[in-house]
Each structure stands twice: as structure tokens, then as C-alpha cells.
Amino acid sequence: MFDNLSGVSYGLLAGILAMLIHLVYQKITELKRRKDELKERESHPTDDLFPKEDFIPYHPSRYSEEEMIKRSNDFYLSMNARRSVRFFSNEDVPDEVIDNIIRTAGTSPSGAHTEPWTFVVIKNKLLKAKVREIIEEEEELNYKQRMGQKWVDDLKPLKTNWIKEYLTEAPYLILVFKQTYGITEDGQKKTHYYNEISASISCGFLLAAIQNAGLVALTSTPLNAGSKLRNLVGRGPNEKIVILLPVGYPSKNCQVPNLKRKPLNEIMIKFD
């Protein structure tokens, strides 16, 4: 039935066939590589979890029941006072405080102890202004075109828009990046297990440390600005931004929405 096909048609079919064969070959090669990697990991099941680490005795502090109840309630009251703040004082914060906050975030658990996070701290005013420029440019498009009217309407009670003064008002910006994979000394990719979950948990530690230090922050997710911010601060293609936090003291006239948190019986299911 191909008797009437021209030489051009035969050439086109041959090209398509060659492309399909190449794609199938690539797929088979990739599947074989993954299978070999899995087989290698299974033959050394503890190598990734405990890479030549020594084990040491561990005896954390133990408190009486009365002290545990008091400490847990005190911590709850402190964290319950935490609010997302959009109005910052430009008053400076000691660098050592920020260093300690980042150290605390770095104590977070991570898959196979890969610690797949990078905390970029920006104090430089010109760089903060550039961050604001990038985010406001994308946020205006988000509000006007990308988010949809329902999302915009849901944000109206919080009185938010694409203007982000806090990005230049707050003394510090902390950008948290997840490392989707690591790079070994010889330039090979290193698997970072559960990198998004691990980095997200570290963000929780970070927020708790900020609250504990007597500072405030705003948890923001720079929608559609991630690659520009990554390039701005010189991070590699293996890193993706998770959250951006302006950090500092609240302004004297700071106000926050009068929001209420869900009671315990709405967030906990308990089996005694």
C-alpha cells in the first residue's frame, strides 16, 4: 500500500522510525540504570542511612511529669502568640541572633541525614530591593492573571496585594532552599531522600526559633519567582526555594487579623 509514496515520504518514515528506536533505547538504558542503582543500594542497605557514622550514648534531659506539663504548656503559649506579620520596624537585629536561629533550623531531622537545605540570609539593602522588585513583578501577574478570582477574593480579608513593602522594611530576609539532590566531591549527583519534607520540617524549626528569640516573620511563598531568586543569590539548579521569610521586630503600629485557631478537638484524633 506504500507503492505510491515518494522518496521523501520513505525518508520521513525512516526518520520517524529511527527516532522511535532511539527513544526506546534511551528508556531501556534509563530503566537499567535505575535498576542497577536500586540493586546496589539493596546490597548495602545501611550505607545510605548510616554512612560510616559512629554511635554514641544518648541521654536527653528527663523531667518530672509536673515539669513536663509546665514546659509543654509554656512552649504552647509562646507559639500560640506567634503571628504572621506584614509590618516591620527597620530596627537592626544582632547578627548572632540570626546565626543562632539558622543553627536551630539546621538541627531538623532529614532523610538519611542528608540535610538538604540552604538558608540564604540577606541583610544588604540593595539586594533586598532587588528581591522585592522580582517578587512584586511576578505577584502583580499572579493577582491579575494567574490566581483566579476566588483565590484573590479569599485573600481580601487579610488585605494582601502584590505590593510587598515588608521585603525592604524588615532588617533580614531568609530564603529557604531545598536541595533536590547533592553534588559529591567528584561532581556526581547524590540522592537527597525526602528533600521537600525534610526542608519543610526545618522551616518549622526556623519559625519556632524566630518566635523564641522575640522576633516576628511572615511566611511567604514567592509564586513563579523561584528561578529568578535562585539566580539572584547564586544557587545551583539543584536548589528550589521553599519559603521566604522577612524577619525582624514588628512596627510600632503593627496590626494583625483577629484570627482564631482551631481547638484541640478539631485537630487531634486520639486512641487511648
UniProtKB/Swiss-Prot annotation:
Q: What stretches pass through the bilayer?
A: 5-25
Residues the entry annotates as binding 3-iodo-L-tyrosine: A112, E139, Y143, K164
One Pfam family name is: Nitroreductase
> Topology versus the membrane, per the UniProt entry?
Single-pass membrane protein
Q: Which domain of life is it from?
A: Eukaryota
Question: What is the protein's known function?
Answer: Catalyzes the dehalogenation of halotyrosines such as 3,5-diiodo-L-tyrosine. Likely to also catalyze the dehalogenation of other halotyrosines such as 3-bromo-L-tyrosine, 3-chloro-L-tyrosine and 3-iodo-L-tyrosine.
Q: What is this protein's record name? A: Iodotyrosine deiodinase
